[in-house]
UniProtKB/Swiss-Prot annotation:
Protein name: Large ribosomal subunit protein bL27
Chain's gene name: rpmA
The keyword Hydrolase is annotated on this UniProt entry: no
Pfam families xref list: Ribosomal_L27 (PF01016)
NCBIfam families: L27
Length: 98
């Protein structure tokens, strides 16, 4: 008795799948209100990771380091000291420009 051992091969090459093709959503960080701009209480001024900008007068710091206005007024970016910057809110435009 004669037995045949047949082996069939694929006629199309198998294609591997890529492990790429994903991307995370942007965090939308940065300065939201510029120097001298009018803001109302609760407006977000800066969204940040860590305290690149520190809160000054009439400015609050959220738990994710977001700076926000606590009163209606004008935004002023100031130097806290040699290496640190702070953001303050002044009710009058003259104080914010000085």
């Amino acid at each position: 008795m004669l037995k045949m051992n047949l082996q069939l091969f694929a006629h199309k090459k198998g294609v591997g799948s890529s492990r790429n093709g994903r991307d995370s959503n942007a965090q939308r960080l940065g300065v939201k209100r510029g120097d001298g701009q009018f803001v109302t209480a609760g407006n977000i001024i800066v969204r940040q990771r860590g305290t690149k900008f520190h809160p000054g007068k009439n400015c609050g710091l959220g738990k994710d380091d977001t700076l926000f206005a606590t009163i209606d007024g004008y935004v002023k970016f100031e130097r806290k000291d040699r290496s640190r910057k702070q953001v303050s809110i002044y009710p009058e435009r003259q104080a914010a420009q000085a």
